[in-house]
Amino acid sequence: MSEIATMAQGEAGAIGPGRLVLVVGPSGAGKDTLLQLAQAACIDDHDVVFPRRVVTRESSAAEDNIAMSPDEFRRGIDHGDFAVHWDAHGHSYALPLEINDDIRAGRAVVVNVSRTVIAALRQAYANVVVVAITAPPDVLAQRLAARARHSDGNIAERLSRSVEDASAQADVTILNAGSADYHSRQLVRVIRNESWRE
């Protein structure tokens, strides 16, 4: 697997004062489920933003991405439409440039990203919080098999990426092996910069 991250050009200094909450974790960890529940919990909080990622594949039912063809994606890069973009698992992903305006306005921006972009984003943004969402390997395998998304590719290969790898650069780790409602409440507390333990 090849993953490459590229930041938008022309930004000077770390962007703030808002927070960039990066959600990372292995396939099948339940990131999209927890993000959907957290977004619903924050629906009336105008200081929390959940931008849609741009992806060069069709979105699944659990995702709210903007699907683009590879050619459209390249044009977006050429036009400077993305704050950051990266390639992973044979697809291209990006975050819209507008997240910078939200962060400058003091909002918390919550995004699902590849862990390969963490270092670059920590340099580009003043207040980055990395939340690793993970689950035991047997739970990951069950979820991936049940999901059976064509773009998941080789499930065994995806599972070989260590669960610990997702947590290596994390500020907070959520072991998503129980109630999605409970774990989404943990995520909301992190997003709102509150204590996340019950």
UniProtKB/Swiss-Prot annotation:
Ligand binding (ATP): G25, P26, S27, G28, A29, G30, K31, D32
Report the catalytic activity. alpha-D-ribose 1,5-bisphosphate + ATP = 5-phospho-alpha-D-ribose 1-diphosphate + ADP
Domain of life, per lineage:
Bacteria
- A Pfam family found in this protein is Guanylate_kin
Under the heading InterPro entries, the entry gives:
GK/Ca_channel_bsu (IPR008145), Guanylate_kin-like_dom (IPR008144), P-loop_NTPase (IPR027417), PhnN (IPR012699)
Q: Which GO terms describe its cellular component?
A: cytosol
Give yes or no: UniProt keyword DNA damage. Answer: no
**What GO biological process term is on the record, naming one?**
5-phosphoribose 1-diphosphate biosynthetic process
Tell me which SMART domains the record gives.
Answer: GuKc (SM00072)
Q: In which pathway does it act?
A: Metabolic intermediate biosynthesis; 5-phospho-alpha-D-ribose 1-diphosphate biosynthesis; 5-phospho-alpha-D-ribose 1-diphosphate from D-ribose 5-phosphate (route II): step 3/3
Q: Which UniProt keywords apply?
A: ATP-binding, Nucleotide-binding, Transferase
Determine if ATP-binding is one of this entry's keywords: yes
* A Gene Ontology molecular function term of the record: ATP binding
Function in brief: Catalyzes the phosphorylation of ribose 1,5-bisphosphate to 5-phospho-D-ribosyl alpha-1-diphosphate (PRPP).
Q: Give the UniProt family note.
A: Belongs to the ribose 1,5-bisphosphokinase family.
Give the protein name, as stated in the record. Ribose 1,5-bisphosphate phosphokinase PhnN
Which organism is this entry from?
Answer: Bradyrhizobium diazoefficiens (strain JCM 10833 / BCRC 13528 / IAM 13628 / NBRC 14792 / USDA 110)
